[in-house]
């Protein structure tokens, strides 16, 4: 698609960008956060719920959909949009990260990767061409190349080999891609090495993809290293193409990513922590299970106008979580997605008015981030899913 991304404004004092991404299912205002619906559903929410909080772009995962219900079934149902009754924008991940998180359950060669299904133990083999074909059959608006994501403790030689294989697979994905109304994004790898990140970004930029993602980050490394790598890598990517930082979704990280020049984010964080009783607020995450909320008559977040905060007291939400009522997870998820949607709208407005830096400083002056040691510990647990299942 021609002119699929328009850059409207750049901050005068940072690299923050305001743009518009055009797809077959509509326009996306950037910077944007995408909720994750790995298995064709954002957990606990309906499409109407998402639209009610101004979400018009979500992510689904090809790995999970390939295994269950299967790409042919979704294609027979008219594609992923019709299958899940979502008429807005869908980005599909190739599933590379999920496959490589299987560790001892997978083997790879130059042709592709073989792995054992975490569902039934069957052996599967996927090539870069398969990954493209699957996503074309799904009919997503944005598809991702198959890449190799090296593990966080990989040696420099292993990171180099993964980067070079990612480059070769990217070329093959580009050659196999024929669905003109679908954008195919490349994925920059290179670990935490500034030199390898430069090489990867420059090589993939030379192939002229419609957009570029930064993979292999936010895998448990300190945040300052994450964003130092992001800032460095983006210097070597074209300014007229969208930049996508995979797996980042904490409010403070969205602000930092935007200041680096990132346009698109996705993460399971808001939905996952919601199901654990954590509500985003301007002051930081609030644990609804705390006894202090047992008698609070007002909403959990007085500054929020979402469905949950308009209709339910913190005391009621506390009760639902203590009783493990399913409604608790739904109401918490609505709130967290609404919070991030509103935050991104405020970020976009601040860039338009060229006051993003003031907005960021004001937000962070009140917001209390999660303890870094606890965050890294949680991240390491989440990276490998549960019961042998790869992460979402």
Curated annotation (Swiss-Prot):
The keyword Nucleotide-binding does not apply. It comes from Dehalococcoides mccartyi (strain CBDB1). Pathway: tRNA modification; tRNA-queuosine biosynthesis. GO terms for molecular function: metal ion binding; tRNA-guanosine(34) queuine transglycosylase activity. This is Queuine tRNA-ribosyltransferase. Its cofactor is Zn(2+). InterPro entries: ArchSynthase1/Queuine_TRR, TGT, TGT-like_sf, tRNA_ribo_trans-like. Residues 247-253, 271-275 are annotated as: RNA binding. Belongs to the queuine tRNA-ribosyltransferase family. Pfam families: TGT (PF01702). Binds 1 zinc ion per subunit. Homodimer. Within each dimer, one monomer is responsible for RNA recognition and catalysis, while the other monomer binds to the replacement base PreQ1. It is an enzyme of class 2 (transferase). Its EC number is 2.4.2.29. Disulfide bonds: none annotated.
């Amino acid at each position: 698609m021609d002119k699929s991304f328009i850059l409207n404004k750049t901050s005068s004092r940072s690299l923050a960008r305001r743009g518009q991404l055009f797809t077959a299912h509509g326009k996306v205002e950037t910077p944007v956060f995408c909720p994750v619906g790995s298995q064709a559903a954002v957990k606990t929410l309906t499409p109407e719920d998402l639209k009610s909080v101004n979400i018009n772009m979500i992510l689904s995962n090809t790995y999970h959909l390939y295994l269950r219900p299967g790409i042919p079934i979704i294609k027979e149902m008219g594609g992923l949009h019709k299958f899940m009754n979502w008429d807005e924008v869908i980005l599909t991940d190739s599933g590379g990260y999920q496959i490589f998180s299987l560790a001892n359950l997978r083997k790879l060669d130059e042709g592709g990767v073989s792995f054992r299904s975490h569902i039934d133990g069957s052996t599967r083999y996927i090539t870069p061409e398969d990954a493209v074909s699957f996503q074309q059959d799904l009919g997503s608006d944005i598809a991702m190349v198959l890449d190799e994501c090296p593990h966080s403790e990989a040696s420099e030689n292993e990171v180099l080999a993964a980067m070079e294989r990612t480059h070769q697979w990217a070329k093959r994905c580009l050659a196999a891609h024929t669905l003109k109304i679908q954008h195919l994004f490349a994925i920059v790898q290179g670990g935490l090495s500034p030199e390898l990140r430069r090489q990867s970004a420059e090589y993939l930029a030379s192939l002229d993809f419609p957009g570029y993602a930064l993979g292999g980050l936010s895998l448990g490394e300190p945040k300052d290293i994450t964003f130092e790598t992001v800032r460095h890598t983006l210097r070597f990517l074209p300014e007229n193409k969208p930049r996508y930082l995979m797996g980042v979704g904490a409010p403070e990280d969205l602000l930092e990513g935007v200041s680096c020049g990132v346009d698109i984010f996705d993460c399971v964080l808001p939905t996952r922590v919601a199901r654990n009783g954590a509500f985003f607020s301007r002051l930081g995450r609030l644990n609804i299970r705390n006894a202090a909320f047992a008698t609070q008559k007002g909403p959990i977040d007085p500054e929020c106008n979402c469905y949950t905060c308009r209709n339910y007291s913190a005391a009621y939400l506390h009760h639902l979580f203590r009783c493990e009522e399913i409604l608790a997870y739904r109401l918490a998820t609505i709130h967290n997605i609404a919070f991030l949607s509103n935050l991104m709208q405020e970020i976009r407005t601040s860039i338009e008015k060229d006051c993003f830096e003031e907005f960021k400083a004001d937000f962070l002056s009140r917001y209390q981030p999660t303890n870094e040691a606890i965050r890294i510990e949680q991240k390491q647990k989440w990276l490998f899913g549960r019961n042998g299942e790869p992460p979402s």
